[in-house]
Amino acid sequence: MSNRLVILGTNEYQNPLIVRAKELGYETHVFGWKTGAIGESTADVYHDVNIMDYETLWKEVQKVDPCGVASIASELAMHPMNYLLRKLGIPCNSLETEQIATNKYLMRCAMRDAGIDGPRFTLVEEDFSKEVLKNFEYPLIIKPVDLSSSRGVMKINSEVELDEAIEYALGWSKTKQAILEEFIEGPEYSGESISYDGKYKLLVVTEKSTTGAPHFVETGHKQPANLSPELFAKVEKTLYRAFASMGIKYGAVHPEFRITKEGRICFMEIGARMGGDCIGSDLVPISSGYDYMGMVISIGCGKKPSFEKIQKPKTARIKYIITKQDLLEFEKMKEEHPEKIKRQSEMKELSDNPILKSADRAGYYITAE
């Protein structure tokens, strides 16, 4: 069998996968539109192909004759990745699971039907009737069913804010559909997990920080989260039930959830992919010691993942630069503890505009201690 690995995507969040695959001895064939992104030069072989043009993509991939296909942290790339895996005869998640994992309404329905705890919710389209909400309690939160990265998300404190929020969310949605839910109070977490042949392992829990209402753009992450062993076990059990309800069997899984003061574990959404924002690629190996990207590569090649730890676990953090104070803290860290900084992004100019989505952040840095 060849050692040629197809990787879909070329941006900075995909680049750690390219680097890790090369470290593991794979010849990396990276596919994506030519934009000058870092992965184009990091790849052993770069292919200027639109990954959403399935016919052309498959034609070019056949020429490579790869041992597998991988991609991380991208819902967009997840669809062509699974398409290629099916064509190559490598086990992967079903088309139904793929659809559920990329539609927040279908996801809620699957978990509700499996008896998993969650808020009241309803589908919102352009002909939405407020009569549906007569049994709902404010505050609510609305999200496009088909987007991630905080795009189109808004908290609604009262009926007065409802029309504006619906217009905002539907304006972002490609399908003109949104999900409206009762808002769950409590700290936010994600559980970085791996699945193989329908068996699951929670590698580490992430403690998340956001801008809060109304848009909840993530400002930083810490691993591992400060959970008691008893609560970790409860989270683990709840996560596995939720994964099974969606039919997830292969690859990385990124569930986002809140834990209420009463101890309820309520999901916000679950991605059948590695978490973005460097959570899976950078933080998980630092905090857990596991080779998360190596696991994803193995599964994408049809092989069982290894759970051997490759390094001693440390506390891992990522901090996003949004304000002048964030920038000052970063400069102080560089001056006083440069050894703690594991990676930093290019920095954009700080903006005075409101932070509405993840792309509005100026940059980030990752630390280990």
Which residues does each predicted region cover?
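ATP-binding N-terminal substructure of ATP-dependent carboxylate-amine bond-forming enzymes
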Residues: 1-96, 302-306, 350-352, 368-369
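A short, structured active-site edge motif that brings together acidic residues
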Residues: 94-105
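Active-site nucleotide/adenylate-binding loops and adjacent lid/helix of ATP-dependent enzymes
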Residues: 103-179, 185, 197, 225-237, ...
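Peripheral (often C-terminal) accessory segments that flank ATP-dependent C-N-forming ligase machineries
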Residues: 113, 130, 295-369
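Glycine-rich phosphate/pyrophosphate-binding beta-alpha loops
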Residues: 150, 271-287, 347-350
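Phosphate-binding core of ATP-grasp and ATP-grasp-like enzymes
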Residues: 169-177, 182-225, 233-267, 271-280, ...
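Gly/Ser/Thr-rich active-site loops/lids in small-molecule metabolic enzymes
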Residues: 282-298
